[in-house]
């Protein structure tokens, strides 16, 4: 099993993507530490928690730095150094025109999607330094790569998350730690339900996207889980600071051409000059 004797911390494991990722790492032999927020424990309790000593569950609000520190410390005491961090905690935030957005809700979105990611990475890095290795996988989204009207908090937080990932990759390149971000595609999830409930507030583009999702059933969460496993494995060594689409990028074929990718601007946020 590829991840035997490895410890994986999954932030936001009670969602559809987080649950699929947790199951995947468990099957590959990892020690799996899972976090959930408030009411979303039940689904986890019925699944992985019944599978024995390689699984542990922690309640966590990523907006609280001291709580993040405490959970990371508890994971270290139970399982030892953390080798893999997967941060798939996130919210869609306010949907609609920015001038009507709740200031509290807008800022809360930034806190969870961006600041929470910083807190978790900041807390886990010393453990990875001690282990002498590490893989960090962040979850971004379509709002990071292009403007997303009526979802300004979400798109701003996800774009910032990608730039955070790119910048940190450079800091960590001599530490044997790689960090990348995933765009999972339209997975059927809690966000999908929130988008439907918003009606026309998200604009015509969102309405059309929702219709397409309903027709196709969306992207399976297992697709994002498979990419997560790849990025956490030795097969992705050297690949860092990239935003990779689980759906549109041919990441299954990338292992042999990682040096080529890393010598280019592929899968990064860049300003496109006028020719």
Locations of regions flagged by a protein language model:
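Conserved glycine-rich cofactor-binding loop
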Residues: 14-15
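Conserved glycine-rich Rossmann-like NAD(P)H-binding loop of the short-chain dehydrogenase/reductase
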Residues: 28-43
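The beta1-alpha1 cofactor-binding region of Rossmann-like NAD(H)/NADP(H)-dependent oxidoreductases
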Residues: 59-70, 103
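Substrate-binding pocket helix/loop in short-chain dehydrogenase/reductase
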Residues: 96-98, 105-107
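Active-site helix of classical SDR
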Residues: 121, 157
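Alpha-helical segment proximal to the catalytic Tyr-Lys
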Residues: 126, 170-171
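C-terminal helical subdomain
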Residues: 181, 201-274
């Amino acid at each position: 099993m590829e991840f035997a004797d490895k410890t994986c911390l999954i932030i936001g494991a009670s969602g559809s993507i987080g649950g699929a990722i947790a199951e995947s790492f468990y099957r590959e032999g990892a020690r799996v530490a899972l976090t959930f927020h408030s009411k979303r424990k039940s689904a986890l309790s019925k699944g992985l928690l019944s599978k024995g000593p390689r699984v542990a569950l922690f309640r966590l609000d990523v907006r609280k730095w001291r709580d993040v520190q405490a959970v990371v410390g508890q994971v270290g005491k139970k399982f030892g150094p953390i080798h893999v961090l997967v941060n798939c905690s996130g919210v869609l935030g306010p949907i609609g025109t920015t001038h009507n957005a709740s200031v509290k809700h807008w800022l809360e979105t930034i806190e969870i999607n961006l600041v929470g990611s910083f807190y978790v990475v900041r807390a886990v890095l010393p453990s990875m330094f001690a282990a002498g290795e590490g893989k960090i996988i962040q979850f971004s989204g379509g709002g990071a790569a292009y403007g997303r009207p009526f979802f300004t908090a979400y798109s701003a937080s996800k774009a910032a998350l990608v730039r955070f990932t790119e910048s940190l990759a450079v800091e960590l390149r001599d530490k044997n730690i790689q960090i990348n971000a995933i765009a999972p595609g339209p997975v059927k999830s809690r966000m999908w339900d929130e988008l439907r409930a918003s009606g026309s507030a998200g604009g015509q583009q969102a309405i059309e996207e929702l219709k397409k999702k309903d027709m196709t059933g969306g992207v399976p969460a297992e697709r994002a889980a498979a990419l997560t496993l790849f990025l956490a494995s030795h097969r992705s060594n050297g690949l860092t600071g990239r935003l990779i689409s689980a759906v549109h990028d041919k990441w299954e074929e990338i292992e042999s051409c990682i040096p080529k990718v890393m010598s280019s601007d592929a899968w990064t946020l860049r300003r496109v000059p006028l020719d």
